[in-house]
């Protein structure tokens, strides 16, 4: 082999060696870069997972209020309740809307609902009464069959007697002595209203009716006198307002007359006082004048 061929083969080997080294370095750099990229992606994934977890925890901790609560608060602010129609037992009341009424109205009635007061309604009056019978009514609202009714005959110092009648209206025949009844209104076996009645005898009822006309006559007389006095005072005030100048002049003249009289009396008093204070004549001067005359 010639020296020239040997030099060419050596140069070729060196070139191939450098190419192999360059390939190994490039491959190693690619692996390192991939590893770094994979590590970065892993860290990014972990960061995203942590961010998502933190966001979920924040969302759980700071959850917005439920729409039902908000709607309920809005309803409370926009709705008012009217007065109950009764002071005891069962009645109705109006539900009034204060915002969002049709036609731009400030208030409008949305519905009518049931309302309840204290159960004890005391002593009531019958719906009708005659000399033979009387009709009593329990506390109720429409419809009548919604509630249950329990009538009792009250006895002094004894247990009450529960009657068979379970309707809202009870008709009682008058007897020789007064009677007392009680009606309990029940809703789902719960007493919601109680009222009592006194059933008088026919003679007591006649006496009560005979005493009423005298009371009514006295009341009418008092009311009539009161109305007449009020009308007279009103007309008097109107007359004074219309003729205020004449009234003022009249009262001015009335007021000036006592002043003139008081001034005259004071002048008279001063005159009488001055006359009383004049000096009397001296007795010596009278004697001198008499001697001179002689």
From Swiss-Prot:
Signal peptide boundaries: 1-29
Membrane side Cytoplasmic: residue ranges: 243-294
Tissue: Testis specific.
Biological process, per Gene Ontology: acrosome assembly
Positions annotated with a glycan in the UniProt record: 31
Biased composition (Acidic residues): 46-58, 283-294
Residues annotated with Phosphoserine modification: 256, 290
Membrane association type: Single-pass type I membrane protein
Keywords: Cytoplasmic vesicle, Disease variant, Glycoprotein, Membrane, Phosphoprotein, Signal, Transmembrane, Transmembrane helix
Modified residues (Phosphotyrosine): 269
The keyword Transport appears for this protein: no
A GO-annotated cellular component: inner acrosomal membrane
Cellular location(s): Cytoplasmic vesicle, Secretory vesicle, Acrosome inner membrane
Post-translational modifications reported in the UniProt record: N-glycosylated.
Segments on the Extracellular face: 30-221
Biased composition, class Polar residues, residue ranges: 258-267
Transmembrane segments: 222-242
Subunit: Interacts with CYLC1; the interaction may be relevant for proper acrosome attachment to the nuclear envelope.
Role noted for this protein: Plays a role in acrosome formation and establishment of normal sperm morphology during spermatogenesis. Important for male fertility.
Name the UniProt record assigns to this protein: Sperm acrosome membrane-associated protein 1
Organism this protein belongs to: Homo sapiens (Human)
């Amino acid at each position: 082999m010639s020296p020239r061929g040997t030099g060419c083969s050596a140069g070729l080997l060196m070139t191939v060696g450098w190419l192999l080294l360059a390939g190994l370095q490039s491959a190693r750099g690619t692996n390192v870069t991939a590893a770094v990229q994979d590590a970065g992606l892993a860290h990014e994934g972990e960061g995203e997972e942590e961010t998502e977890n933190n966001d979920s925890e924040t969302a759980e901790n700071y959850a917005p209020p439920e729409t039902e609560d908000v709607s309920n608060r809005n309803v409370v602010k926009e709705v008012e309740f009217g007065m109950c129609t009764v002071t005891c037992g069962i009645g109705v009341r109006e539900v009034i809307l204060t915002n969002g009424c049709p036609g731009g109205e400030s208030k409008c009635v949305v519905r009518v609902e049931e309302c309840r007061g204290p159960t004890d309604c005391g002593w009531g009056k019958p719906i009708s009464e005659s000399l033979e019978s009387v009709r009593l009514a329990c506390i109720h609202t429409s419809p009548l069959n919604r509630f249950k009714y329990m009538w009792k005959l009250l006895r002094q110092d004894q247990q009450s007697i529960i009657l068979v009648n379970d309707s809202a209206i009870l008709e009682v025949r008058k007897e020789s002595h007064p009677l007392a009844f009680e009606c309990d209104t029940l809703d789902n076996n719960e007493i919601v209203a109680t009222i009592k009645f006194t059933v008088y005898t026919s003679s007591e009822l006649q006496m009560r009716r005979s005493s009423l006309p005298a009371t009514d006559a006295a009341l009418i007389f008092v009311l009539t006198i009161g109305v007449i006095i009020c009308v007279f005072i009103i007309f008097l005030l109107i007359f004074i307002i219309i003729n205020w100048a004449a009234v003022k002049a009249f009262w001015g003249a009335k007021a000036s007359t006592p002043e003139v009289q008081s001034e005259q009396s004071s002048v008279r008093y001063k005159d009488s006082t001055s006359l009383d204070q004049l000096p009397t004549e001296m007795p010596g001067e009278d004697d001198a004048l008499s001697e001179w005359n002689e």
